[in-house]
Amino acid sequence: MWKADQWKDYEVLDTSDGEKLERWGSFYLVRPDPQVIWSTPRQDPRWKRFDARYARSSTGGGHWSAHHLPEHWCIHYRELTFQVKPMNFKHTGVFPEQAANWDFIDDQIRRAGRPVSVLNLFAYTGGATLAAAAAGASVCHVDAAKGMVAWARENAAASGLSGAPIRWIIDDCAKFVEREIKRGRRYDAVIMDPPSYGRGPSGEIWKLEKDLF
């Protein structure tokens, strides 16, 4: 089993009754987690002095209850820097568990001993993109959401990778791949972490079971 055990700015402190208590840098967040099906005593005092808590609504969605929480702040993983921004549907812009994959990407690229080109699809805020670029690869970062690509570029700048060979593409991933095939473009590695549901830049509806499987 791979473990994302190199974090210093993130940790799961406790879990109980469908929620997890996390530390993101110097801030404590409480977020729902459907995998937490057990009920245990909440003995950690930080359950009561969290900086923000996301509560689901019975009608769908939910909202954050925040106490003196900034709009965004930065956390670090090894040499990478990420902006954390609590947003809709409990997300923060970073999936800390993906760090195990970032370590794998870093290792494979460094061991290749030659230039490596990577295509990162559904690239979100750029965790895998930054890991690949920091290891020396040239990366094509593709996501349908303009805001996510802008956020990824901010993460790259914060990580000292503004000058890295990264192509930033706002496009429907499937359509982009079709065009790359027609152009005869080849990559050494393709990374994909698609959402189960989403929308393209022109409002196209994406469903994992329909559009990928």
Model-derived segments and spans:
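Conserved acidic residues
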Residues: 26, 116, 188
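Conserved class I S-adenosyl-L-methionine
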Residues: 113-124
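Conserved SAM-binding loop of SAM-dependent methyltransferases across substrates and taxa
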Residues: 125-137
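Non-catalytic substrate-recognition/targeting regions of SAM-dependent transferases
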Residues: 6-22, 29-96, 103
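S-adenosyl-L-methionine
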Residues: 144-191
